[in-house]
Design a protein with these regions (language model features):
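Radical SAM enzyme [4Fe-4S]-AdoMet core and its adjacent flexible, acidic
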Residues: 1-44, 48-50, 54-55, 68, ...
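Alpha-helical packing segments of well-folded alpha/beta enzyme cores
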Residues: 149, 203-206, 234, 307-310, ...
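Short amphipathic alpha-helix with an adjacent loop that forms part of the alpha/beta core around
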Residues: 203-210, 271
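Distinct, well-ordered alpha-helical segments
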Residues: 232-236, 264-274, 338-340
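Secretory pathway export signals and precursors
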Residues: 5, 24-25, 69-72, 153, ...
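Short cysteine clusters
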Residues: 9, 28-29, 73-76, 157, ...
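N-terminal [4Fe-4S]-dependent radical SAM core
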Residues: 1-15, 43-150, 168-171, 175-185, ...
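Core AdoMet radical
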Residues: 146-156, 167-199, 213-229, 241-267, ...
């Protein structure tokens, strides 16, 4: 179901992401990070993790429909403009609030005048509140009930994925520094502005007092979580909290990993799983969206054979009740033609180990030239093949997975949505930040030309089926730069 034209999203209230490496916090993976400054940290203490001044102001903008003040949310609206399902969650308010039943349709298809008349109900106290009367001091703008938390211990990473950046990968940062894309000032800027030990102490205070009681999901992301030196000590501390506080909950703990780690590291994680599975429902989501040499090009530094070996190792884990394995699929402008072969790998893992394999779907929107929405309609045929393969399985007879958004049925619906949008050239109608779609395509050529030169690879050798598109982008780039 495509989203409505409201600006509301409950993720702003319930989905904090804490970056210990930079001392920053944000809500939702698609928003900008907010560096914690000493003055506000001293004032708010552990309340900084969900109720900073920045977050309070953004929540007010979400409720009031101030789209022009929500710059970090534009990727979702652009997806929706392109007829693609976005991650935005406009359907419900944070506990204990709800839109009044008689106003719910108005919220979905509002006009500015109507929006001010919407009534919100506190269903614990039955107190009613007009949306127009909400101010920065209103309780509804505060959050004490996060439902999902992501942790970045650091951006330490062993890959330079094409659509990543120096912000999330130390390998990327090293390359950017080498070629002058960033300077030493950027590297200094990326360091925490507050004492790291105080930040971590404050986090655990917030986690034990607030977050642990409402969290349903906790994600370890990166960087690359498997190679963080303090991964296991952090997990030990988290398990200690759950055991000590006896919350009676068994939340999901998931890891988003490139699965490129050494056999020694994967073996250690494998041996640690029984301990984790006593406290959590554990999920490992391997980040991948293509196959073989294409996957190695997109995720520069990846060893495909090692990736497959590690996937088989984890799938062999016998506890199918408390441990689940799957893939985090970031559909992008290069993944389309290798997707079918990758899906067949996932199917083989299910058949070999008789366990459900999760297919979590996502889409790259930044940088814009990595979005599949810039592709010409002839690329839809590759997704026709994926859709045909999935429909013939059929997907509703695949082994079950714990996440409704990770089922093969959900993935089929998602990839059909992308296929149709490419086929209908919805990308040409999107209000791109960098200009019209041809400007983005020109940047595609410019960027991958530089990518090939720096990393000593060859785009067209790996993706010969892109030749016509690539040359078209080259011509657009030359026109843009006044060469022709």
């Amino acid at each position: 179901m495509l989203k409505t034209n409201s600006t509301y999203c409950t993720l702003r209230w319930g989905y904090p992401i804490v970056d210990f490496g930079r001392g920053s916090i944000r809500t939702c993976c698609r928003t900008f990070e907010e560096r914690v400054e000493p003055e506000e940290f001293e004032e708010k203490g552990s309340d900084i993790f969900l109720n900073s001044d920045y977050q309070i102001k953004n929540r007010l903008a979400h409720l009031k429909g101030y789209k022009n003040k929500l710059n970090s949310c534009t990727t979702c609206w652009r997806l929706e403009d392109g007829k693609i399902e976005s991650p935005r969650l406009p359907e419900w308010l944070p506990y204990p609030y709800s839109f009044k039943d008689s106003d719910k349709n108005m919220v979905k298809e509002f006009t500015d005048k109507e929006l001010t008349e919407v009534t919100i109900v506190n269903y614990v106290t039955n107190e009613e509140l007009k949306l127009k009367d909400i101010t920065l001091e209103s309780d509804i703008l505060r959050s004490q009930n996060p439902f999902m938390l992501e942790i970045l211990l650091s951006t330490h990473c062993d890959l330079k994925c094409s659509y990543c950046s120096p912000q999330f990968s130390t390998k990327w940062a090293e390359e950017a520094l080498k070629f002058g894309d960033v300077d030493k000032g950027y590297m200094d800027w990326s360091k925490p502005h507050i004492d790291s030990e105080e930040f971590e102490d404050s986090f655990w205070l917030w986690f034990d007092d607030i977050a642990i009681h409402s969290l349903d999901r906790i994600g370890m992301v990166g960087g690359e979580p498997m190679i963080q030196p303090n991964l296991f000590s952090f997990l030990d501390r988290m398990m200690e909290s759950y055991n000590r506080l006896d919350t009676k909950k068994k939340p999901i703990l998931w890891f988003v990993t490139n699965l490129n780690a050494s056999e020694k590291i994967i073996d250690r994680f494998y041996e640690y799983l029984p301990k984790l599975c006593e406290v959590f429902q554990v999920e490992v989501h391997a980040s991948i969206e293509s196959f073989g040499k294409k996957a190695e090009y997109i995720r520069f530094g990846l060893n495909w054979d090692r990736f497959v070996r590690n996937a088989n190792k984890l799938c062999s884990y016998e506890d199918k009740k408390n441990f689940h394995f799957g893939f985090q699929i970031a559909n992008n402008s290069m993944s389309i033609t290798g997707l079918l072969d990758f899906i067949k790998v996932a199917k083989d893992l299910q058949d070999t180990y008789k366990r459900g394999i999760t297919l979590k779907h996502n889409i790259v929107t930044i940088p814009e030239f990595h979005s599949p929405m810039i592709l010409t309609k002839d690329f839809a045929k590759y997704l026709d093949e994926v859709v045909d393969y999935l429909e013939k399985l059929p997907v509703n007879r695949m082994l079950p997975v714990p996440d409704p958004l990770g089922t093969w049925e959900s993935f089929l619906e998602w990839i059909t949505n992308i296929r149709d949008s490419i086929k209908n050239q919805e990308g040409e109608k999107i209000d791109w930040v960098s200009g019209d779609v041809n400007n983005i395509r020109a940047s595609f050529y410019e960027w991958f030309k530089k990518y090939d030169e720096r990393r000593e690879v060859n785009f067209l050798e790996v993706f010969p089926e892109y030749k016509e598109f690539y040359n078209s982008c080259k011509e657009l780039c030359e026109v843009k730069n006044g060469i022709i």
